[in-house]
């Protein structure tokens, strides 16, 4: 009977503290993301199509070409003004979203939503090689944070939910942008967090579920298909032609390594060597360059959806595909590093489709049946994207969902993706957005240096982490649980480790945290959101040891919210007394490794100063 009551109590608590918040937050952010991203995607598609028509009109009326370039300069200057006014627009939208999901940054969500949409529309109008999918993910993640911020009014512990809700919003944005719900969930787990946990999975799935319902409902009302690409039934490739897969895998792996390297080097060149060139001038240059390309080769501009569909429909000769490949490859390396706003998912897929079109035509010339052409194009798209993003599962599932076609039963695609992935892994090529994310993270703390700190926190009853496993928690960025101190049945303190992260967190346990961060106070504050019971008012004091780079968290004097200000004054007096006692203590003999590392960091910092 007691056991049944305990199980019933656990289930009620689980529903109240986990399932209900996931459904509520996921439902709100999913519905809002579905509405906003669907509208954004529709506007982006309209502007891109109109941009192509504008370029075609100027080609037929060359007398007015100066007006075209004047208009492009105006668009570029407006984009530069927004770039300067809104910091969230200075970094790639995917890198921004992944940074928010990992806890490396927060949005000012009002200006981010407005700025992302407006600045992206300027890029699409100018014909830049940007897609709508990257900004859609940023919009979704921003809406997730906004939902969480409003949740402060209804859920006391909502700061602890922030990264989960941001993840759910990003997954919803991805799902609506591509019409690929499963890929949206996979993307956040494989690419953003690089981990799988039940809470992350449920949060992402909840948001994606509601966003997909909204998106498909709107699509049904206006008669618009949710599928990204429109193709017929694909032909399964026989085993005797699997030699083509080896060529595709090697070609995509080498090309992805080259692309990621050139993209990263170009970004370094802009930030380090060309830093004196103002951002507005770089943006004006890329708009004008796109204008020249649009007048000469209008099929090569835009996000790339038209190009992919045209390649699948055999609309281009191999000569056109070859020229388009070099033009798009160069533009895609330069454009995102200029400071203009837009996404890279579809442009990257377009590069893969162009390579697939060229290889497909080459294989056909070598005797392969033309019925396998579309299959080769889709396999190459998947492989190139999986290699550049370092997200093979997401790439495979994405192409299947975009086409609504379960081609080649995953086997042929899995082979090529594996080959390409092994190549970029062997060459130690960073994922496409990783470098941009880390650079923006460092710039946010310019003048500071990351140091190692160690502090302890006590888990309170009713806190966010209580009853959950260590691996299920999104701990503050740069923080690792070193060991756990708990009290056994006999009342003795036991010091243990939990490398697998399977241990269930209980109230009263003390967790030692090792943090490699720029701002130790911020790390402590975020840890408090997780381990603190918001039903009680607590005053937190952070004390720094003399000659020690680490910090120790001292939490004192829990007081009820209804206690008077006089009681709060007593709390302050208790802190003053504690500080005097603490500062006279000697440094403990443990933490030698951390103490030495921090000492070296501080010495380097003082030498630099």
Task: List PLM regions with ranges.
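Short, surface-exposed ligand-recognition loops at beta-strand->loop->(often short) alpha-helix junctions
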Residues: 457-465
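Low-complexity, charge- and small-residue-enriched intrinsically disordered regions
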Residues: 277, 432, 550-571, 576, ...
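Short, solvent-exposed beta-strand edge segments and adjacent coil->beta transition regions
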Residues: 452-456, 508-510
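Long, low-complexity, intrinsically disordered segments
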Residues: 572-609
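Cytosolic Rossmann-like ligand/nucleotide-binding regulatory domains
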Residues: 466-530, 536, 540-545, 552-558
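A generic structured-segment signal
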Residues: 24-25, 472-475, 595-596
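Long, charged amphipathic helices and adjacent flexible linkers at domain junctions
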Residues: 433-452, 536-545, 549
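Alpha-helical transmembrane segments and immediately membrane-proximal extracytoplasmic
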Residues: 1-445, 461
């Amino acid at each position: 009977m007691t056991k049944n009551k305990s199980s019933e109590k656990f289930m009620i608590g689980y529903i109240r503290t986990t399932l209900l918040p996931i459904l509520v937050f996921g439902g709100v952010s999913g519905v809002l993301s579905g509405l906003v991203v669907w509208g954004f995607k529709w506007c982006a598609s309209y502007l891109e199509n109109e941009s192509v028509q504008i370029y075609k009109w100027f080609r037929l009326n060359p007398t007015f070409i100066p007006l075209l370039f004047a208009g492009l300069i105006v668009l570029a200057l407006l984009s530069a003004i927004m770039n300067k006014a809104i910091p969230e627009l200075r970094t790639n939208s995917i890198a921004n979203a992944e940074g928010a999901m990992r806890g490396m940054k927060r949005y000012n969500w009002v200006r981010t939503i407005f700025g992302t949409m407006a600045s992206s529309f300027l890029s699409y109008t100018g014909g830049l090689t940007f897609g709508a999918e990257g900004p859609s993910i940023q919009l979704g993640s921003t809406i997730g944070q906004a939902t969480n911020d409003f949740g402060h009014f209804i859920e006391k512990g909502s700061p602890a939910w922030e990264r989960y809700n941001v993840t759910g919003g990003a997954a919803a944005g991805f799902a609506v942008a591509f019409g690929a719900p499963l890929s949206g969930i996979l993307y956040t787990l494989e690419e953003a967090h690089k981990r799988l946990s039940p809470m992350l999975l449920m949060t992402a799935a909840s948001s994606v579920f509601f966003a997909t319902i909204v998106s498909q409902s709107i699509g049904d009302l206006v008669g618009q298909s949710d599928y990204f690409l429109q193709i017929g039934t694909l032909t399964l490739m026989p085993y005797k032609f699997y030699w083509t897969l080896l060529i595709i895998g090697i070609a995509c792996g080498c090309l992805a390594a080259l692309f990621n390297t050139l993209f990263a080097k170009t970004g370094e060149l802009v930030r380090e060597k060309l830093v004196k060139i103002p951002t507005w001038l770089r943006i004006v240059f890329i708009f004008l360059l796109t204008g020249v390309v649009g007048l000469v080769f209008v099929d090569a501009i835009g996000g790339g959806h038209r190009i992919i569909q045209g390649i699948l429909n055999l609309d281009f000769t191999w000569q056109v595909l070859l020229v388009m490949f070099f033009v798009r490859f160069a533009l895609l390396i330069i454009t995102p590093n200029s400071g203009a706003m837009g996404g890279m998912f579809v442009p990257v897929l377009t590069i893969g489709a162009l390579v697939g079109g060229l290889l497909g035509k080459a294989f056909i010339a070598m005797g392969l049946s033309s019925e396998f052409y579309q299959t080769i194009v889709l396999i190459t798209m998947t492989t190139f994207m999986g290699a550049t993003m370092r997200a093979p599962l997401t790439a495979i599932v994405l192409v299947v969902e975009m086409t609504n076609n379960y081609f080649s039963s995953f086997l042929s695609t899995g082979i090529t993706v594996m080959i390409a992935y092994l190549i970029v892994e062997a060459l130690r090529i960073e994922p496409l957005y990783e470098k941009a994310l880390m650079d923006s993270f460092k710039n946010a703390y310019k003048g500071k240096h990351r140091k190692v700190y160690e502090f302890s926190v006590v888990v309170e009853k009713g806190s966010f982490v209580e009853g959950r496993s260590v691996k299920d928690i999104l701990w503050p960025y740069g923080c690792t649980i070193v060991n756990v101190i708990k009290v056994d049945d006999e009342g003795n303190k036991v010091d243990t480790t939990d490398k697998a992260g399977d241990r269930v967190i209980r109230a009263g346990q003390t967790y030692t945290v090792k943090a490699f961060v720029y701002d130790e106070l911020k790390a402590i504050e975020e840890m408090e959101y997780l381990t603190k019971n918001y039903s009680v008012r607590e005053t937190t004091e952070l004390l720094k040891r003399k000659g020690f780079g680490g910090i120790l968290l001292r939490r004192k004097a829990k007081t009820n919210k209804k206690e008077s200000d006089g009681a709060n004054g007593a709390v302050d007096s208790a802190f003053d007394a504690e500080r005097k006692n603490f500062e006279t203590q000697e440094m403990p003999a443990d933490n030698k490794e951390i103490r030495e590392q921090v000492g070296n960091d501080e010495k380097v910092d003082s030498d630099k100063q």
